[in-house]
């Protein structure tokens, strides 16, 4: 059975698990390395276990392992570790490393599903999972619709990552579990708001900021800080929680704002995604909402094209220039 797309996808072996971002500070690289090793320790035996049951399960399981070990910023494990240390916890404790691995698996779940919802063609410079499996379906002449098959497989792979994320926190205390559960709800609620905003044309800046905070900002920094602190000392977390939020929420907002700029202006070699992807998808970002609020009539006509999947590169460049001219980037 030919498996061209899957066979040629890059893999990570046990000897190449070091964090790939050389520019990252040493403290972040140490955290990333510990989490990568832990992910490999968990996922490789699981891959072999299920492949022994049925060889057809090897590739789906390998997709989870490939994505979580293919790079990424590792910010969530880092902030979880730093929150743990902030209340006196050991930054090298097994529970906080497991929590970091849980965050990476949860993020993988979100990426698998997000790529399906956005119909994204690439992720981190590689074809997205649903496109690879859809192409495989077509090449092998299987019954049914190739696109729906690819999307279905990607959704199920994402669901598996979600389950493995929960398993990593099996030994967490009750306070930490409450935070983890709230994080999962917030992430999914934010994604619902994002989808609705993409089709309804969100123009209100406050609404766009709320979407971004719940889709990404809270679960990137604030909640990892909370979870790390609660894992170290639930009682001290009750005192430190508001302090961590006062730091984490605005920083999370800033992170998402930068991500929005990259989504609108970043090149594919930097982002690993097509140029202008957020503009073609009509993402309800604060950046776009600010541009629309400040746009002249002529600029508004250009910005009205946001959300068209068939935008040419020239039209994307025109929209980018209109955003700059409105002062939304200032």
Regions found by a protein language model. Give the residues of each.
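All-alpha prenyltransferase/terpene-synthase fold signal
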Residues: 1-330
């Amino acid at each position: 059975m030919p498996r061209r797309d899957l066979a040629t996808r890059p893999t990570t072996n046990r000897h190449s698990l070091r964090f790939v971002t050389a520019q990252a500070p040493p403290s972040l690289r140490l955290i990333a390395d510990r989490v990568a090793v832990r992910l490999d320790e968990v996922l490789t035996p699981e891959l072999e276990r299920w492949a022994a049951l049925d060889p057809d399960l090897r590739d789906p399981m390998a997709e989870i392992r490939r994505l979580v070990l293919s790079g990424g910023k590792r910010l969530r494990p880092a902030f979880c570790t730093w929150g743990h240390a902030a209340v006196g916890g050991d930054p090298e404790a097994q529970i906080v490393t497991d929590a970091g691995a849980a965050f990476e698996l949860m993020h993988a779940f979100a990426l698998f599903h997000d790529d399906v919802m956005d119909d994204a063609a690439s992720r981190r410079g590689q074809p997205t999972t649903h496109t690879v499996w859809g192409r495989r379906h077509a090449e092998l002449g299987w019954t049914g619709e190739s696109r729906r098959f690819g999307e279905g497989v990607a959704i199920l792979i994402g669901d598996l990552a979600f389950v493995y994320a929960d398993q990593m926190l099996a030994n967490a205390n009750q306070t930490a579990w409450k935070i983890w559960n709230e994080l999962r709800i917030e992430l999914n609620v934010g994604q619902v708001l994002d989808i609705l905003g993409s089709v309804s044309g969100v123009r209100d800046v406050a609404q766009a900021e709320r979407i971004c905070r719940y889709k990404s900002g809270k679960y990137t920094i604030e909640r990892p800080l909370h979870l790390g602190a609660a894992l170290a000392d639930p009682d001290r977390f009750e005192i430190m929680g508001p302090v961590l939020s006062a730091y984490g929420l605005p920083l999370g907002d800033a992170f998402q704002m930068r991500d929005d700029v990259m989504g609108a202006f970043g090149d594919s070699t930097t982002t690993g995604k097509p140029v202008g992807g957020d503009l073609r998808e009509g993402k309800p970002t604060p950046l776009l909402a600010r541009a629309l609020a400040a746009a002249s009539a002529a600029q508004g006509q250009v910005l009205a094209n946001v959300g068209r999947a068939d935008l040419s590169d020239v039209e994307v460049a025109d929209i980018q220039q209109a955003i700059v001219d409105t002062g939304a980037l200032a």
